[in-house]
Amino acid sequence: MKLNIGCGSRKVPGFTGVDAVAERTAAEIVARADNIPLPDQSVEEIMAIHLFEHFYRWECDTVIAEWKRLLIPGGVLTLELPNLKKCCENILSGRMEGGKHPDQLSYWGIYGDPRHGDQFMAHRWGWTPETLKAFLTEHGFVKIKEEPTQCHPAGRNHRDMRIVARRG
């Protein structure tokens, strides 16, 4: 089984959608990311695209422990999220791109999209590749690497990061 946790309305072929909001059309499992009703070591891959930044730092330990519980040994965890360092560099350099919303590469990466009006869509913690790799290592993940981003066209390459790790 492969999970797309925090799927929203995005269906990904080969992945089972998980979201805490029942109205999300792609969610086949309605559950919080820190309490998914599946057996231990029953998942071969977890993908969480633009989800991990929505947790407070103190929640991240519980969330990652749940995902580790679900993954088989050697199972893959893929996280894609804003890179706080790139967001800050974009602010300091004055890099403003994104069409109608020129602050997508900077402030949106830090705070989230201000148009939602939904407190759960706010970003609650920022990560850099270094801090996220250290966090995952601390939680027993191995073979941690940074890969080119694949989602969020506005942020690809200039704002976001993609980290892939394996459960140790």
Describe the residue ranges of each PLM region.
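N-terminal start-of-chain detector that recognizes signal peptides
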Residues: 1, 50, 134-138
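Conserved SAM-binding loop
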Residues: 2-87, 163-168
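S-adenosyl-L-methionine-dependent methyltransferase catalytic module, highlighting the catalytic core
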Residues: 59-62, 66-68, 72, 76-168
